[in-house]
Amino acid sequence: MIPLSTAVAVPRGFTFTSNLYGFELKQGDQMVATLNRPRVWSSEFIAAMAGQNWIIHRSGFWGNKGEILDTASHQQIAVFKFGWGGKGDLFFADGQKFFVVTRGCWHPVWTVTTELGEPVFQLHTREKSVELHNVAGVSESRLSLLVLFTLFRVRQAEEAAAVAAAAAS
């Protein structure tokens, strides 16, 4: 995998591909990071980027929260609290806070903003691309983790839509 900082220099950011088990984040033909489900029915995902690994999974009694854990120490790095209408807050252990918002029919655009409302990036599910905006105050590792977490939320939305469609038929 190549460092994410090389992807930041690209005007559009980077692209992603999806498969049954997860996503691959790419700059051109080179893989930057991955998000994979270790087993088909597993509720957790493993996020990996150039020597760093995290576990991302749902938590809370109703599954209404999300957690990012360090794979080595299992320490909590961040907590996500779901909100109504596709919104949510992502709180990191160091105090940094981001908002994750989705808009459009069937959630085609996911936007991550800083606590002050400045957009960090937009993830376009139909184009399978990530458009970077204001990444100056976000470390390379944190940016990668934010994109991978957003892809985790995309997969959750896809699975929820599939369940709703199956129940309706």
Locate the predicted segments by residue.
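Intrinsically disordered, low-complexity proline/glycine-rich segments
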Residues: M1-S169
